[in-house]
Amino acid sequence: MEIKQIMVAGAGQMGSGIAQTAADAGFYVRMYDVNPEAAEAGLKRLKKQLARDAEKGKRTETEVKSVINRISISQTLEEAEHADIVIEAIAENMAAKTEMFKTLDRICPPHTILASNTSSLPITEIAAVTNRPQRVIGMHFMNPVPVMKLVEVIRGLATSEETALDVMALAEKMGKTAVEVNDFPGFVSNRVLLPMINEAIYCVYEGVAKPEAIDEVMKLGMNHPMGPLALADFIGLDTCLSIMEVLHSGLGDSKYRPCPLLRKYVKAGWLGKKSGRGFYDYEEKTS
């Protein structure tokens, strides 16, 4: 099946990034969010990113306008009836995702592929709430979407070969490298990355070193472009906690137990860069 019309459901950092990347590849994209203000904020965010690219000479003003003209905001989820694929990019919450997939299954025509940008939740379980499990698949983009080249493609137990091939082809058209992985908690990326971040948090919790020192060790000693604690702040500490909880409950191994300090920060509202404070203080930088 040739995919022409795309809807992105969820206009946060990931959703707006996916919409921008798809439009940049020549697709017409509808972007929806249950909160209309969030949809407008998502559009504003991607416009700002495109303008920044133009200032740096990475694209012309004409190209920027062309990309923006291929993105429209949907006022209702009902507009998904026009889509060949819906890429869900809402909060990492199973109840919210399954509810959305039930709704999309009712709205969308039979040929529409329902893809989830989940970073850790089981695709098979999400697909099971629909009447089209063969058309449900995981399409896990990396953050920031316009920059990062990887897309993890995850088949559920019932995902058809045709659906997988269509999504792999779509990812390639969007300028990404599609890597197929199996449907296990955290897939590959977060099963490897998040325990490392969690261990770095334990190093803070146990007084091994300060966040700056830990990040410096990993950058200079392991050639990481960003330290694990700065990366955790960038991802969002609430998201990190959610993924660690999925790994811990899904795999049952104590090595995936979330650090108590991570829980404490999330309960305090210290979520990282988006809240102004996490392992680093971002409020001073923005004031």
Curated annotation (Swiss-Prot):
Residues forming coiled coils: none
Induction and repression of expression: Subject to catabolite repression.
GO molecular function: 3-hydroxybutyryl-CoA dehydrogenase activity; NAD+ binding; oxidoreductase activity
Annotated pathway: Lipid metabolism; butanoate metabolism
Biological process annotations from GO: butyrate metabolic process; catabolic process; sporulation resulting in formation of a cellular spore
Catalytic reactions of this protein: (3S)-3-hydroxybutanoyl-CoA + NADP(+) = acetoacetyl-CoA + NADPH + H(+)
Gene3D superfamilies given in the database record: N-(1-d-carboxylethyl)-l-norvaline Dehydrogenase, domain 2, NAD(P)-binding Rossmann-like Domain
InterPro entries: 3-OHacyl-CoA_DH (IPR022694), 3-OHacyl-CoA_DH_CS (IPR006180), 3-OHacyl-CoA_DH_NAD-bd (IPR006176), 3HC_DH_C (IPR006108), 6-PGluconate_DH-like_C_sf (IPR008927), 6PGD_dom2 (IPR013328), NAD(P)-bd_dom_sf (IPR036291)
Listed EC numbers: 1.1.1.157
Keywords: Fatty acid metabolism, Lipid metabolism, NADP, Oxidoreductase, Sporulation
Site (Important for catalytic activity): H140
Family to which this protein belongs: Belongs to the 3-hydroxyacyl-CoA dehydrogenase family.
Matches recorded under NCBIfam families: PRK05808.1
Protein name: Probable 3-hydroxybutyryl-CoA dehydrogenase
Name of the encoding gene: mmgB
